Amino acid sequence: MMNQDTLPNLYDLSLAEMERLMTAWGQPAYRARQIFRQLYVNLVDSPLAMTDLPLALRERLVAETRLAPLAPEQVHVADQGLTRKALFRLENGVLIESVLMIYPDRATVCVSTQAGCGMGCVFCATGTLGLLRNLSPGDIVAQVVWAAREMRRFAAERCISPSLAPPDDDSWWTPDTLEDQGSSEARSISVSRLSNIVFMGMGEPFANYDRWWRAVEILHDPRGLNMGARSMTVSTVGLIPGIRRLATETLPINLAISLHAPDDALRSALMPVNRRYPLAALLEATRDYLAATGRRVSFEYVLLQGKNDEPEHAAKLAALLHGEAGTTPLPLHLVHVNLIPWNPVPGMPLGRSERRRVLTFQRILRERGIACTVRVERGVSIAAACGQLAGARGLNVEC
């Protein structure tokens, strides 16, 4: 019997690679398109369910390939069922987490690109694990397939008719509010399928760039899940080579950069990566990215009580983005700041900014002409919010 670990994972294969496999097997190329459709449109979990294929081909797929859909070991639910965090155990035993967030007009899945993370940001639960391993393209794609299946079940339960395609727009930008939308949101749901992907789960995508980008191309393929490029967002701690590489890619993926501090001393204390890629170099790379793409960039800023949330921090951040601190000025019409009140992580001696401080910080930035919103929170009670994913039961916040 062949070792299952050495067999090709169907979720790892692009359509072109699947066509080459079929050709090598003496099959017509259109068989690959049938398989691709079964995987990403019909969302089957076994080659035997691909009933438009000859039985002999289905049996060969079972024998000579792997199809490893993710089945969660745990699913935690919050926000009246509109936020769902899944804990998955991968084939080699490591744990990762994904979060599905359902809104009235869209459904977004937050997926992991690594098991653990080696960036060591002091406010993030994932960083406490260290880097366990990079995820394969198939590991990343399988998380999205899980979310697509969840949305199919959700729509069926609510008798929502499927929409034809996900929005290819800027709907990932967060609403300008801190208010809990509550039960009215649950009643007004009309979305029926997965529409957005954010690569903001466990890990640093640009530290696993090649595998992450292969997953992006598979997810974008119009013959499969057909996720619009502008419906996908990648978040980085500021790995400059990745930012520069993304600027050259043909798919216009949205970019979010974790900033979290307005000066090098504070940012280095919060984010060790700043010692390698300090703010001046990061802003220069951001300016070059904006010039090359013309696409908006979001700066994410986690607010920590008494550490980076004072009015003087907001003023320094505004000066930084305006280029008044000896750094590269940015075209502010292409810049957005996303404020994120810190979400608690057990054992971390940090505090969450008060609402008053959050709104003051936002006001100062807006008065300087900087677009700024506060992220609407989801899943805090189940440790599914920003910075809380740890891929381990012991670090989860109990409901």
Curated annotation (Swiss-Prot):
Reaction proceeds by a ping-pong mechanism involving intermediate methylation of a conserved cysteine residue. This is Probable dual-specificity RNA methyltransferase RlmN. The keyword Protein biosynthesis does not apply. [4Fe-4S] cluster binds at residues 117, 121, 124. Belongs to the radical SAM superfamily. RlmN family. S-adenosyl-L-methionine binds at residues 203-204, 235, 258-260, 343. Specifically methylates position 2 of adenine 2503 in 23S rRNA and position 2 of adenine 37 in tRNAs. It is found in: Cytoplasm. PROSITE patterns: RADICAL_SAM. GO terms for cellular component: cytoplasm. It comes from the Bacteria. Its EC number is 2.1.1.192. The keyword Magnesium does not apply. GO terms for molecular function: 4 iron, 4 sulfur cluster binding; metal ion binding; rRNA (adenine(2503)-C2-)-methyltransferase activity; rRNA binding; tRNA (adenine(37)-C2)-methyltransferase activity; tRNA binding. GO terms for biological process: rRNA base methylation; tRNA methylation. Its main location: cytoplasm. Its cofactor is [4Fe-4S] cluster. Keywords: 4Fe-4S, Cytoplasm, Disulfide bond, Iron, Iron-sulfur, Metal-binding, Methyltransferase, rRNA processing, S-adenosyl-L-methionine, Transferase, tRNA processing. Binds 1 [4Fe-4S] cluster. The cluster is coordinated with 3 cysteines and an exchangeable S-adenosyl-L-methionine. Transmembrane segments: none annotated. The active site is at 97 (proton acceptor), 386 (s-methylcysteine intermediate). Residues 103-381 form the Radical SAM core domain. InterPro entries: Aldolase_TIM, Methyltransferase_A, RlmN_N, RNA_MTrfase_RlmN, rRNA_lsu_MTrfase_RlmN/Cfr, rSAM. Disulfide bonds join 110-386.
